Each structure stands twice: as structure tokens, then as C-alpha cells.
């Protein structure tokens, strides 16, 4: 697996829920957080013309952010950034306070999720182009397939999941860990395996791969249909205390 590169990130995560006044019967059983169709969608807020004029060449980055039940985005992180993508990184991180998503749904109710995706900026025929995909799988990114990877759900009433903490050997240490997960069509994690950790040997991979087996995800969707998924999920560690907890 290619080396994960932690670039620039902002992570002031507040875990809170605001339940909108929506009838559960009007919502599907599962729906991932999606790009909205409003002017404040992430793909509409990123100013591709300005990026080209300021000298941004082809660039790619992966991102994660918290999406609330109101559809607001928070705590954007960017990583695995291609060389020379600094202007794109700054543009993406600067838009998180404005962006709106279509909120996720779990068992017919809106739910907060941790969403991951990829942003690809490229120039073709002298014009800028921007693609925002809600997965980070190499083959799906190459093909541009309609795949929304499973999203970590901040689901209440799941006492088995006790959260993800720093390993005892490295409390408060900045780090990155990637795990390969299998998630079924109910959102249950059926398998997890460490794919990468940096710095190595301090237990960050195991600190994610073990607890995440008890977490709940919004299942993955391919071509609009629920599918079991085998995918890579990345978590960055920084700041003191708990990294991820669902309640």
C-alpha cells in the first residue's frame, strides 16, 4: 500500500446530534451522507476556475469529515495528497464551514456520520475539472464508478463499541492508521485487518482494527443499491483523548 501522507488537517470534532423533525416513515432504512444538489454542495463550493488561474495543476487528495443530521460538514481532514496540490488542499479545508451534504439515514432516522472521499482536480483542453467521489478505492477511482463506501455511524444504543483510543505505548502521539474492513448490507463489520500504520510499531493499527469490529456503519452503495463491501478505512490520530465514539 502506498505510504499515507498526512498533509494539512483541521480536527475540532464535536460529537452532537440534532434530530430534525422528520417522520421516520418518510426515510429509507439506510442512506449514506451524499453530496447535496444545492449551491453549497462541496463540488459547487470549490472554485475550480480560481484554482487554475492561481496555478494549480492536476492534483488529488483524500478527505474525511463529520456530517451532522442537519447535513452540515465539520472537522475536515485531508491526506494522501499528491505533490503540488497545496492550493487544492487549502481550498477544500477553507470550505468546510460552508458545505452542505444530504444527511445520512440509519433505520429510518437521520444520523451523524464520518464520511470519507476523494477529490480529483485536473486540467483538460485548457479547462479545469473537478470530481468528488465518496470512496477511496483505487479501482473505483480509476473507473469513476458509482460507489459510496460505508460510513462510520455515530449510532446510539451500541454499548459494544467502546470507542477508539490511543495505544498505551503512545498517548497523544500524532499518527495515521488504515484498516481493511468488510461491512455487510446491515452495516455490521464482519472482518478487520491492519493495512498500514505510521509511525509503525506503536500499536496504532491494532488500536483501530480491534474496536472497529464492534462499530456500526451505514452500508455501502454501488449503483444506488446496497452491497457488502471490502474497503480501506483511514483514521488520523492527534490531540489528547478519545478519537471516535458513537454512544
Language model segments and positions:
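Charge-biased low-complexity segments
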Residues: 22-247
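Bacterial N-terminal signal peptides that target proteins for export
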Residues: 1-11
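Bacterial N-terminal signal peptides
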Residues: 10-18
Amino acid at each position: 500500500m502506498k505510504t499515507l501522507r498526512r498533509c494539512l488537517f483541521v480536527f475540532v470534532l464535536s460529537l452532537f446530534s440534532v434530530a430534525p423533525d422528520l417522520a421516520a416513515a418518510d426515510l429509507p432504512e439506510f442512506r449514506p451522507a451524499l453530496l447535496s444538489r444545492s449551491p453549497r454542495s462541496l463540488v459547487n463550493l470549490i472554485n475550480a476556475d480560481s484554482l487554475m488561474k492561481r496555478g494549480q495543476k492536476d492534483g488529488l487528495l483524500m478527505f474525511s469529515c463529520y456530517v451532522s443530521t442537519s447535513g452540515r460538514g465539520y472537522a475536515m481532514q485531508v491526506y494522501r495528497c499528491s505533490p503540488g496540490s497545496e492550493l487544492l488542499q487549502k481550498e477544500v479545508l477553507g470550505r468546510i464551514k460552508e458545505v452542505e451534504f444530504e444527511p445520512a439515514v440509519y433505520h429510518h432516522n437521520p444520523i451523524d456520520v464520518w464520511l470519507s472521499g476523494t477529490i480529483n482536480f485536473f486540467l483538460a483542453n485548457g479547462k479545469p475539472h473537478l470530481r468528488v467521489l465518496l470512496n477511496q478505492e483505487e479501482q473505483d477511482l480509476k473507473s469513476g464508478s458509482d460507489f459510496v463506501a460505508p460510513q462510520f455511524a455515530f449510532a446510539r444504543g451500541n454499548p459494544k463499541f467502546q470507542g477508539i483510543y490511543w495505544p498505551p505505548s503512545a498517548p497523544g502521539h500524532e499518527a495515521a492508521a488504515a484498516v481493511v474492513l468488510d461491512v455487510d448490507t446491515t452495516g455490521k463489520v464482519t472482518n478487520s485487518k491492519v493495512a498500514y500504520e505510521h509511525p509503525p510499531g506503536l500499536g496504532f493499527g491494532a488500536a483501530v482494527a480491534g474496536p472497529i469490529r464492534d462499530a456500526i456503519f451505514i452500508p455501502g452503495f454501488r449503483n444506488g443499491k446496497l452491497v457488502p463491501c471490502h474497503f480501506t478505512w483511514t483514521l488520523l490520530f492527534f490531540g489528547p483523548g478519545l478519537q471516535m465514539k458513537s454512544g
